[in-house]
Design a protein with these regions (language model features):
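A conserved beta-strand/loop element that lines the FAD pocket in flavoprotein oxidoreductases
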Residues: 1-2
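C-terminal catalytic lobe of FAD-dependent flavoproteins
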Residues: 78-80, 87-88, 99, 103-217
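Flavin-dependent oxidoreductases
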Residues: 5-94, 98-108, 117, 123-126, ...
């Protein structure tokens, strides 16, 4: 983890347990730690409350209960409990919104009971006995009410991308373009690599033969 950030003549110096890293720019996309990282480099601007959301993933036998995402009215903590079909034919239900300390992704009986009761207000006949998986994630609930995107006041070259909650994944490409615009305004970005090729292999586990699935799991 980063333990200290200092401004230098050429940009920034970040102290870590592995040593000091020097860079011209910092993009603060540290999730629930973004407030702590920001406060090392610039005056305090926002507060993040880590908020756990718990989910049910139900068997495909429940996947046809709904044919599009069913939202309830959101509140100050987030989007509320939704019921949605997945691309693989399952049904996903959740989340709740419980303030936690740090990255606490434990599922709780109370949290899952809240999720199931809230979901039944939208879709009364869900069979939660068909649950095949429960999981939880922690989102960065920020007190500004919206994403924090921009160069920090009094800290040129330090860019916050913080407070990303429920739509963060969907908006990631647009957020990245905003970050690039800020960097371009400084006028010294390297040119894009014209010959860049994404060579990463994409494994579609569902489509693999049984022996290949077993090899990857082992």
């Amino acid at each position: 983890p980063v333990t200290r950030i200092e401004k230098t003549a050429g940009g920034w110096a970040l102290t870590t347990p592995s040593g000091i890293v020097e860079t011209r720019y910092i993009i603060n996309a540290a999730g629930i730690s973004a407030q702590a990282v920001h406060d090392m480099a610039a005056p305090h601007k926002f507060t993040i409350q880590p908020t756990r959301g718990e989910y049910y993933l139900l068997d495909k036998s429940e996947g046809s209960r709904v044919h599009h995402v069913i939202f309830q009215c959101p509140n100050e903590n987030g989007k509320g409990v939704l019921v949605a079909p997945t691309v693989h034919g399952n049904l996903i239900v959740g989340p709740n919104a419980d303030p936690v300390e740090g990255d606490d992704t434990a599922c709780t009986a109370a949290g899952l009971a809240f999720v199931s009761a809230a979901a039944r207000r939208s879709v009364p006949n869900i069979r939660f006995s068909e649950s095949i998986r429960n999981f939880a994630g922690v989102r960065a609930n920020v007190d500004t009410g919206d994403f924090v995107i921009g160069e920090a006041e009094g800290a040129p070259g330090f860019i916050d991308l913080a407070g990303m909650k429920s739509p963060g994944l969907s908006s990631a490409p647009a957020v990245a373009r905003e970050a690039v615009k800020i960097l371009e305004a400084h006028g010294d970005l390297p040119a894009p690599k014209a010959d860049y090729r994404d060579g990463r292999t994409r494994v579609r586990f569902k489509e693999l033969p049984p022996e290949e699935k077993a090899r990857l799991i082992a």
